[in-house]
Amino acid sequence: MGFTMDEEVIFETPRELISIKRIKDIPRSKDTHVFAACITSDGYPLIGARRTSFAFQAILSQQNSDSIFRVSTKLLRFMYYNELREIFRRLRKGSINNIDPHFEELILLGGKLDKKESIKDCLRRELKEESDEHITVKEFGNVILKLTTSDKLFNKVYIGYCMACFINQSLEDLSHTSIYNVEIRKIKSLNDCINDDKYEYLSYIYNILINSK
């Protein structure tokens, strides 16, 4: 699958507008975020599910009271069931309908670059932390993708950089592990998330990086 340096591919979901572009190098700054498109030893693409949804986290950060929630109905479909129950418990008026009990906040594994570490050292550290030390890195791919995500709900733009990461563990190895990380609740195969809004662009990212090893 070819993907030139000048080519930009755009995906849109109900919540996001995502630009994917191949670049030569990852810039180093205090705000650089890097992510790993992890592939198991038996060839499965991995994805993380956040413990808390971005929507619920944003609501909590904007509250001035412990007892009152002010929530846009547009956010409700992007929250976990237990988060919706907490909102419902605090409602003074209105109701919550059309709850999706199967919602998951899918994310690529990775995080913010520390100024004293290399890109690969950052990814090794993040994967170790987010998997509770269950994931170890075999090798990294050579292709780098720049991901520019426009969040239509919060009117914010996020930039991250992604590369393939081939790990030593199989999907079976990871399926029997429990994760207690504060951010990640589960690591699973992207193939199990075909009905998720993010599946199309995430699978595109993996296909580009895997086929460019």
Curated annotation (Swiss-Prot):
Quaternary state and interactors: Interacts with the late transcription elongation factor VLTF-4/OPG110. Interacts with the late transcription factors VLTF-1.
UniProt motif (Nudix box) ranges: 111-132
Lineage of origin: Viruses, Varidnaviria, Bamfordvirae, Nucleocytoviricota, Pokkesviricetes
Top-rank taxon, per record: Viruses
Similarity section: Belongs to the Nudix hydrolase family.
Residues reported in the UniProt entry to bind Mg(2+): E126, E130, E183
Binding site for N(7)-methyl-GTP: E16, R50, D151
Name assigned to this protein: mRNA-decapping protein OPG121
Cofactor: Mg(2+); Mn(2+)
Gene3D superfamilies hit by this protein: Nucleoside Triphosphate Pyrophosphohydrolase
Catalyzed reactions: a 5'-end (N(7)-methyl 5'-triphosphoguanosine)-guanosine in mRNA + H2O = a 5'-end phospho-guanosine in mRNA + N(7)-methyl-GDP + 2 H(+)
Recorded name of the encoding gene: OPG121
